[in-house]
């Protein structure tokens, strides 16, 4: 009878061993799954931190959307704006604060680097014909006038800060024709000497009478 009991106990132990191993294997598999899922989550978090694609950032970035720029559209808009500005202005520029000795020849040579010139006029004094230190230049193309204004305004030339402005559409420089340098012509004396002396005596007598009325005695 003793032998039978020992056999049965050994059988029970043999049969119980696989039941104990199964939960251990299941636990190990669960641990592996959790570790792999946690590692995947950590990798995703790292990627989000590097690329800046976290969920909180996505929610905040919804208010700040970046628009794609179309270079062709921008170029067309710029061209249309430039055309409008060119239509509003003429090809004439006003230049002031010119230094001494900077006349028509110097102006035409200096501003010819921006484009072809139609006309160059310098304002002059009516009597002396000296420069009044400002003038007008008319370009063939309006674009050249705009470039000349942008590059030469507030430009230091021979100790003078130039002031350059593009005149509006319809402006002309006809005004400066009356400031042309005039040639002084000496006129000869046509009156006789006796008549000139008589006129001088008459004026002198009138002056003495005026002085006498004011109480001043004058003899000549």
Curated annotation (Swiss-Prot):
* Name of the gene encoding the protein in the UniProt record: NOP15
Q: Provide the organism lineage as a comma list.
A: Eukaryota, Fungi, Dikarya, Ascomycota, Saccharomycotina
Location within or outside the cell: Cytoplasm; Nucleus, Nucleolus
Q: Write down the Gene3D superfamilies for this protein, in alphabetical order.
A: 3.30.70.330
Comp. bias intervals (Basic and acidic residues):
9-30
Question: What additional remark is attached to this entry?
Answer: Present with 4280 molecules/cell in log phase SD medium.
What name does UniProt use for this protein? Answer: Ribosome biogenesis protein 15
Q: GO terms for molecular function, please?
A: ribosomal large subunit binding; RNA binding; rRNA binding
**Does the record carry Transit peptide as a key word?**
no
The Gene Ontology biological process terms listed for this entry are: maturation of LSU-rRNA from tricistronic rRNA transcript (SSU-rRNA, 5.8S rRNA, LSU-rRNA); ribosomal large subunit biogenesis; rRNA processing
Species whose genome carries this gene: Saccharomyces cerevisiae (strain ATCC 204508 / S288c) (Baker's yeast)
Q: Which domain of life is it from?
A: Eukaryota
Q: Where is the composition biased (Acidic residues)?
A: 39-60
């Amino acid at each position: 009878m003793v032998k039978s009991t020992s056999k049965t106990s050994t059988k029970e132990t043999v049969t119980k061993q696989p039941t104990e191993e199964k939960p251990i294997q299941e636990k190990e598999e669960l641990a592996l799954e959790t570790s792999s899922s946690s590692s995947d989550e950590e990798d995703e978090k790292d990627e989000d931190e590097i690329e800046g694609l976290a969920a909180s950032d996505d929610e905040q970035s919804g208010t700040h959307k970046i628009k794609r720029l179309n270079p062709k559209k921008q170029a067309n808009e710029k061209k249309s704006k430039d055309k409008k500005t060119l239509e509003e202005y003429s090809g004439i520029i006003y230049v002031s604060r010119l230094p001494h000795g900077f006349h028509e020849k110097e102006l035409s040579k200096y501003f010819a680097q921006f484009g072809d010139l139609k006309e160059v006029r310098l304002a002059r004094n009516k009597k002396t014909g000296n420069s009044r230190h400002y003038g007008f230049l008319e370009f063939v193309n309006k674009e050249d006038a705009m470039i000349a204004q942008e590059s030469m305004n507030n430009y230091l030339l021979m100790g003078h800060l130039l002031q350059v402005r593009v005149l509006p559409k319809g402006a002309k420089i006809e005004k400066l024709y009356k400031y042309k340098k005039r040639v002084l012509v000496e006129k000869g004396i046509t009156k006789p000497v006796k008549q000139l002396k008589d006129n001088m005596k008459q004026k002198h007598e009138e002056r003495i009478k005026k002085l006498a009325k004011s109480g001043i005695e004058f003899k000549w």
